[in-house]
Amino acid sequence: MDSDKGWRQRKARVQLAEVSGELAAAQQTHSVNIWYGKWQSSRHVSVHRLDPERDSGVTRGDSSGTWKFCLYFARGLCALGHKCEYLHHIPEQSDFDRYLVEGTPLLDCFGREKHAENREDMAGVGSFNQQNRTLYVGNIGNAAVMKNGKPLNSRQVESRIRYMFGRLGPMDRVRYLPEKNCAFVRYRHHITAEFAKEAMRDQSLSLSMAQDAALGAQDSTGLLVKWAREDPDPQSRAHKEEDLVNALLSLLPPQQTQTPSRTTSRTTNKTTNEATSKVRKLHRKVYRTTTAAMSHKNILTSYDSD
């Protein structure tokens, strides 16, 4: 699913006129978690939500050429609008291409620093040792999955998940487990997963913002969105390997990646097979080199901390 390109023709709108004094006061009454430097609070349905069709637009970030997205825009509460120094639109292929050139695996799509390891609860920014594209979505049963006052059935819930997460960027797979009250959403690019993780955190699956506001006032719990752990299923690992190989194959000239026709000579087939073999060897070499470099960096970091 490609995002609406009409946002390029308009300025980004202000999502929130001003910061609520009630929210600021409420934040100051909570305890501080000294390990993560954040306020501790109970989860509830957010009264703010990103509307990609209405909120997307041009900002100062587009003029400056930044690759970083606005975190507050993703959460539906940026008060700067077109004056914001960060991007206000859904991540597109061009953003991913720019990230590969100008970005760094040490930062997420919002410019926040990643860590060597994921948190134990798989929340937070994530790890720079792994480009995770799969999100774990929990607490679905309590996230206001209702229609006309009645609970949705399993098929309707999965359809709602596909719609709500699909409008934030192209997805590869969605797996809903009603007996576990959770789902797994896998995106095509990791920057899209990073964006969607923040955009759908503490949201509901309702289509009405008015219903979200009512649920927020009732302290109802929203969606629990965090990083999915690596799937031990061999089929899942095969899919991951295939994705990496396809990404490297896309870097080859078109004539070396086209499927040979029946009239293609044996020489052409041999050249294509050799190119594919080189790409697979390159993938294994890059993986080993990257792993070794990251391990070396972790050792240096531990020495610095000592």
Curated annotation (Swiss-Prot):
SUPFAM superfamilies: CCCH zinc finger (SSF90229), RNA-binding domain, RBD (SSF54928). Residues 251-277 are annotated as: Disordered. PROSITE patterns: RRM, ZF_C3H1. The keyword Transit peptide does not apply. Keywords: Cell cycle, Metal-binding, mRNA processing, mRNA splicing, Nucleus, RNA-binding, Spliceosome, Zinc, Zinc-finger. It is found in: Nucleus. Residues 133-230 form the RRM domain. GO terms for biological process: mRNA cis splicing, via spliceosome; positive regulation of cell cycle; positive regulation of RNA splicing; spliceosomal snRNP assembly. InterPro entries: Cwc2/Slt11, Nucleotide-bd_a/b_plait_sf, RBD_domain_sf, RRM_dom, Torus, Znf_CCCH, Znf_CCCH_sf. One of its GO terms (cellular component) is U2-type catalytic step 1 spliceosome. Residues 251-268 have a biased composition (Low complexity). Associated with the spliceosome. Involved in the first step of pre-mRNA splicing. Required for cell growth and cell cycle control. Plays a role in the levels of the U1, U4, U5 and U6 snRNAs and the maintenance of the U4/U6 snRNA complex. May provide the link between the 'nineteen complex' NTC spliceosome protein complex and the spliceosome through the U6 snRNA. Associates predominantly with U6 snRNAs in assembled active spliceosomes. Binds directly to the internal stem-loop (ISL) domain of the U6 snRNA and to the pre-mRNA intron near the 5' splice site during the activation and catalytic phases of the spliceosome cycle. Belongs to the RRM CWC2 family. This is Pre-mRNA-splicing factor CWC2. It comes from Candida glabrata (strain ATCC 2001 / BCRC 20586 / JCM 3761 / NBRC 0622 / NRRL Y-65 / CBS 138) (Yeast).
